Amino acid sequence: FPAGRLDKDTTGFVLITDDGEFAHRILSPKNHIDKTYVVSLRDNIEEEAVSLLENGITLRDGTAFLPSKIKILSDKECEITICEGKYHQIKRMFCAVGNEVTNLRRIKMGRLFLDERLRDGECREITADELKMISEKE
């Protein structure tokens, strides 16, 4: 079964496992496993938006998101690292700062990067060392 999920229009890293205990451990919010995404946006990324997202943001409906880490890649593209996994989290966060996500791809879980040799829909087994990397902090 999948350890975590992606929205229907998000691509990238999905971990499938038969180890329920491991899946629970990496999915549990108390363990704060980092997940990194490449985000393409409709509009340029504003400094104020980066600051708000990096400090944590609360939506009008009261939903609070923990601080995220953002690395600017270009005017309309960034990497964002979050440790939660709330419903449509990244899309909702960027909407709250006046922008819209046009493409979203998960590239990393914990310290393990998505294997760039894999095309969408392909999979491979991970090694024991890679498995450990998922639950390790940077």
Annotate each language-model stretch with its function.
Residues 1-138:
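Basic, flexible Lys/Arg- and Gly-enriched helix-loop patches that mediate nucleic-acid binding at interfaces
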